[in-house]
A protein has these predicted regions:
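Short S/T/G/P-rich N-terminal loop/turn motif that feeds into the first structured element of a domain
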Residues: 1-192
Length: 192
């Protein structure tokens, strides 16, 4: 199992890493088949591990995965994160549903508007126990650059659908549509 081999290698390197997940898009994507997402305690921890990896482990790993998949170190992107809401309880599932929204503020809206929207969202107490979200800020220069990336996480598609029904029964969809454009309207890129 390549995942177990990778985990063993990372453990032997002594990297300070908070976790890693492989997420696969629900719809085919032109530029990738999956994303290997790594969570770091700091940018310094990420840079130290990444430098060690590139200098001492990258070539051997490429041989190990040859014919299975390939990756480009030029496509390793760092985001800072801010947790918007923690789950009421952590899911014990090994799989999750992720929704990424790459958003820009509409005219008249800004981070203060987003703050108010988040306060309204966080006041809803009936969302599923395992839902949580965070805001991501690219620490690189994507083109086009979003004002922020909104990431929702659920343990299942069913929990997501239930929460969306609750969200849609409020005034929050209208507030979101007035505040931001994410994709062509408010579109998410969905991952398992």
């Amino acid at each position: 199992d390549l995942t177990a081999q990778w985990n063993k290698k990372i453990d032997s390197m002594g990297c300070q890493m908070d976790g890693a997940n492989i997420i696969t898009p629900k719809e085919d994507q032109e530029n990738f088949d999956f994303i290997w997402m790594m969570v770091w305690p700091s940018e310094q921890a990420r840079d130290a591990c990444w430098s060690d990896w590139l200098e001492n482990h990258d070539a051997e790993w490429r041989e190990t995965i040859s014919g299975v998949w390939d990756y480009s170190s030029e496509n390793a992107f760092l985001f800072s994160s801010e947790i918007g809401r923690l789950p009421k309880s952590w899911s014990t599932s090994d799989s999750f549903t992720h929704s990424y929204f790459f958003c820009n503020f509409n005219e008249g809206s800004d981070f203060n508007t987003l703050h108010d929207y988040r306060a309204d969202l966080n006041s809803i107490t009936t969302l599923s126990d395992n839902h949580w979200y965070m805001l991501l800020d690219p620490m690189f220069d994507p083109d086009p650059r979003p004002d922020f990336v909104w990431l929702d996480i659920w343990p299942t598609d069913e929990a997501r659908e239930s929460d969306l029904a609750i969200w849609n029964s409020t005034n929050l969809p209208a507030k979101a549509a007035e505040m931001v454009t994410c994709g062509e309207s408010i579109d998410a890129t969905m991952f398992d």
